[in-house]
Regions:
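Non-globular targeting/processing and membrane-anchoring segments
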Residues: 1-41, 127, 143-189
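A short, flexible beta-alpha/helix-coil linker loop
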Residues: 30, 77-81, 139-140
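Short active-site neighborhood of thiol/selenol oxidoreductases, capturing the structured segment around
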Residues: 30-61, 71-75
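Short, solvent-exposed loop/turn segments at secondary-structure junctions
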Residues: 48-50, 78-79, 118, 147-148
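Short, solvent-exposed loop/turn segments at secondary-structure boundaries
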Residues: 54-56, 84-87, 125, 144-145
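Conserved segment of the thioredoxin-like fold in thiol-based oxidoreductases
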Residues: 68-114
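Thiol/disulfide oxidoreductase modules built on the thioredoxin-like
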Residues: 105-107, 113-155
Length: 189
C-alpha cells in the first residue's frame, strides 16, 4: 500500500491519448493493447490476489457482450501477495499467475501481461483496480481509479448512445467472502 499515492492522480485523464504497448497475453501471443475491433475498449487493471478485481470479474466479463464493446485486463503486480502466490520475481512468475487466472479461475477476457517493471501499469496510473474506457481513436473517454462495474456500465451505455458520460465512479469494497477467499488463496503474507 505504501507504493500507492492515493492523493495524486497519475495516468491518462479523460480526453488524453491512451498509452499503447505491445504486450504478451496470457495465451502467449504478442498483441498491441489498443488494437481492438470494436468502438470502445474497457481496460481493467487486475491481479489474481486483488479482492476488488476478483469481486468484479464476472460482471466486467459480461460488459464485453454489449455490441460495440471490447474488454481486456492488464495484469499488474500482485495486490496482496502471500506464501502461495508471491510477488513476481521474474516475468515468468507474472505470466504464470496470469495464465492461472485464465485457465484455473476462468477469466474470459484477453489478459495482457505487463512487464516485471510495470511500465504499462505505471503509464495507466499504477492503481491496482483502475478501469479505463478508450475509444477507437485511442482517447480515454472514462476513467476510475477504483473500478465500479455499475458506473462503468452506465458510462458505456452513455457513450454507445452518443451521450456525454454522466456516471461518477465511486469506491465500493469487495464482499468479505471474496476478500477471505482471495487472500486465502494467496496464502499468509
Amino acid at each position: 500500500i505504501e507504493d500507492y499515492d492515493f492523493e495524486t492522480e497519475f495516468g491518462p485523464d479523460v480526453g488524453d491519448k491512451a498509452p499503447d504497448f505491445a504486450l504478451t497475453t496470457a495465451s502467449g501471443e504478442t498483441k498491441t493493447l489498443l488494437d481492438f475491433p470494436n468502438m470502445f475498449l474497457v481496460l481493467e487493471m487486475g491481479s489474481i490476489t486483488c479482492p476488488l478485481y476478483q469481486s468484479r470479474r464476472g460482471i466486467m466479463e459480461r460488459l464485453a457482450e454489449i455490441d460495440g464493446v471490447s474488454s481486456a485486463v492488464l495484469y499488474v503486480r500482485e495486490a496482496h501477495p502471500g506464501a502461495n502466490i508471491q510477488s513476481h520475481k521474474s516475468f515468468e512468475d507474472k505470466m504464470g499467475c496470469a495464465t492461472r487466472l485464465t485457465t484455473k479461475e476462468g477469466e474470459s477476457r484477453t489478459v495482457f501481461v505487463d512487464g516485471l517493471e510495470g511500465k504499462a501499469h505505471k503509464a495507466y496510473g499504477s492503481m491496482p483496480n483502475a478501469v479505463f474506457i478508450i475509444n477507437k481513436n485511442g482517447c480515454v473517454v472514462y476513467r476510475a481509479e477504483w473500478n465500479n462495474p455499475s458506473a462503468t456500465r452506465k458510462a458505456l451505455l452513455d457513450l454507445l448512445a452518443g451521450r456525454a458520460v454522466t456516471a461518477k465512479p465511486y469506491f465500493r469494497p469487495a464482499l468479505p467472502t471474496t476478500v477471505f477467499r482471495t487472500l486465502g488463496n494467496a496464502g499468509k503474507g
